[in-house]
Amino acid sequence: MAFLKKSLFLVLFLGLVSLSICEKEKRQNEEDEDENEAANHEEGSEEKRGLFDIVKKVVGAFGSLGKRNDLE
């Protein structure tokens, strides 16, 4: 009976150790995914800002052309 108890405790202990290792790897993967998502979001906002600047310049150029035509 003592042999069965020791075997059972050993199996449970090894199971808990492997479970904790899996949880640790899972948390690390989630952190990596969060970092990648944050980096992608930053790149997207930079692209939006760059596009917004271009649109402002184009609108400003057309606005100044319209003012020149009104003066003539």
UniProtKB/Swiss-Prot annotation:
One of its GO terms (cellular component) is membrane. It comes from the Eukaryota. The modification Leucine amide is found at L65. Expressed by the skin dorsal glands. Residues 27-47 are annotated as: Disordered. Keywords: Amidation, Amphibian defense peptide, Antibiotic, Antimicrobial, Cleavage on pair of basic residues, Fungicide, Lipid-binding, Membrane, Secreted, Signal, Target cell membrane, Target membrane. Residues 23-49, 69-72 form a propeptide. Residues 38-47 have a biased composition (Basic and acidic residues). GO terms for molecular function: lipid binding. It holds the Pfam family FSAP_sig_propep. C-terminal amidation enhances antibacterial activity. This increase may be due to stabilization of the alpha-helical structure at the membrane interface. InterPro entries: Frog_antimicrobial_propeptide (IPR004275), FSAP (IPR016322). It is found in: Secreted; Target cell membrane. The keyword Signal applies. GO terms for biological process: defense response to bacterium; defense response to fungus; killing of cells of another organism. Residues 1-22 form the signal peptide. Belongs to the frog skin active peptide (FSAP) family. Aurein subfamily. Amphipathic alpha-helical antimicrobial peptide with moderate to potent activity against Gram-positive bacteria, Gram-negative bacteria and fungi. Also shows a weak activity against biofilm of both Gram-positive and Gram-negative bacteria. Probably acts by disturbing membrane functions with its amphipathic structure. Kills fungi via membranolytic action. Enhanced sterol levels in lipid composition membranes reduce interaction of this peptide with membranes, having a protective effect against the lytic ability of the peptide. Shows anticancer activity. May be monomeric or may oligomerize as homodimers or homotrimers in Gram-positive and Gram-negative bacteria mimetic membranes. The primary structure of the mature peptide is identical to that of aurein-2.5 from Ranoidea raniformis (AC P69018). This is Aurein-2.5. It comes from Ranoidea aurea (Green and golden bell frog).
